[in-house]
Every structure is written in C-alpha cells, then in structure tokens.
Amino acid sequence: MTGCASQSPEISQKVNWPTQEQQLSKLTHYQASGKLAYKDNQQRFGANLNWQTNNQNDHLLLTNFLGQTLIKLDTTPKSVTLIDYKGNEYHGTNAAELVRRLTGINLPIEQMQNWLIGLPTAADTFQLNDQGVVGYLAKQIGPQLWEMHYQEYDFSQHPALPSKMILSQGKQKITLVINEWNLK
C-alpha cells in the first residue's frame, strides 16, 4: 500500500526566532493588502485594508467593497493626516487620538507598524508559537490592555509574515486577514 500525507504549511514550518526577529527588524518598506473586520458593542463593519510602511511613514487606506474610501490615514513621526469618506481632511500629531476623536474607534496605530509584521516591539509581553514566530503579544496603553493573537502565518515569505491576526481590547475585536505582502 502506498500513499502520501500532506501537512498544511503552517504546521510543517518552523523558524529560528532570533533570525526571524532580526529580519523583521530590518523591514523598513512593506505593503500589506487584505481585509479588516471590526466589532464592538456599538458597531461592526468590514473593509478592504491597504497598509504601507516606508521607513517611519505609514499609510492606511480602508475602502468598502465598492472601492470607495472609508478612511485614509497618513502618519509621519511628527504629523498625522486623516481623510474621511466625505473627503474632509483632519490634521494632528497623534494618530490613535485623531482616529478615536473622528470615528469613536480606539486603535493602537503607533504600534501597528511592527505588530502587523509580527514584531513585538514595545509589547509588554509576547509568546512564540510552535512554529517559532510570535503567537501572542500584549501591551498596556494607558488604561487599555491590547492583545494580538496571531492565527496564521505565510511561510512562503522570508521572513515569515502574519496572514491572519485578531487584535482585541475589552469588547473591541479587530480581525485582520492579509492576502498579499509586498516587501520592497
């Protein structure tokens, strides 16, 4: 009798964390495209997600299923610009504060540059999973405890990058599914 067994790539892959961490730390230019689902006690919505990081500058674009802009956010170390779905432009110096003030949604924008790629920079605690990549991290930001659970990774990328993660704080839950990574 002959046969073959196949394993999912997530199970068969294992990385060396110090090497993975070093490679992630060197990523200064990348783009992630996928989907975002947001849920709390008051609202729920889904959006197409496009995140770009270029050194310390970030660009977040959320669009609906028709491709219409919901939010466009550009951050630099010194300034933040948010454009809403009506085309109104807002400026500030703190991305999380500006998003919260205009949408009512709390997001740890400043930490997402690293957390999105599975780098636990500035996290209070983190744990590696069986594949040797970050499976969980947590960070206290003011009175809020933010937790990121990494569900799946794309091991075809080098370094391996998250493809599904859940960010939560209290009753807020944000599911991120990354369909495409572009490392520049």
Question: How should each PLM-predicted stretch be described?
Answer:
Residues 86-140, 144:
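Flexible, processing/modification-adjacent segments and terminal tails
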Residues 43-47, 71-74, 145-147, 173-175:
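Amphipathic hydrophobic-ligand
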